[in-house]
Amino acid sequence: MHAAMQRGAPDPSEIIFKALLAASSATSDKLAEGNKASPKTKPPYRLLTVAYAANPSDITMPERPDGTRQVALDFVALVYDREGYLFTQQSNTVNVFAKPAAIDQFLKEGVRYQQRIAVPAKGEYYLRVGIHDMIGDKVGAIEIPVASIATTPEQSKSQPAK
């Protein structure tokens, strides 16, 4: 997984997925919850939301004696500058033992997960996102220039959402 997540590395395609990306138009002095930052990283930040949608047929789901299936995935988002220096990172591991009904739903709807990661508001950065199937040791990853990610308007606190 480490080599697959390096800035500029070829995109591994053992797990095919889509990533819906949205950047907050507002800035924040705080990292997104769970983010780790290098000492070089300074606020303000723009928060990005990453919504993963992966093909379930690419995920290893061994059946257990009790009829459940184990799914163990690591969702990783890394922010690099153009020289490849790592600024912020977010990694979330999901390890579940799913009953047959849940697996049926999983197969119909796909693998879905959402993360937030902070990106320094000024400068040229690249977001590399990936999924690691920890049971099958398969990886999928893509890299996106942060400047190409659309911003979403913030909801006004005084205006109700429509």
Over which residues does each language-model region extend?
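Scaffold/interface architecture of coatomer-like assemblies
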Residues: 1-162
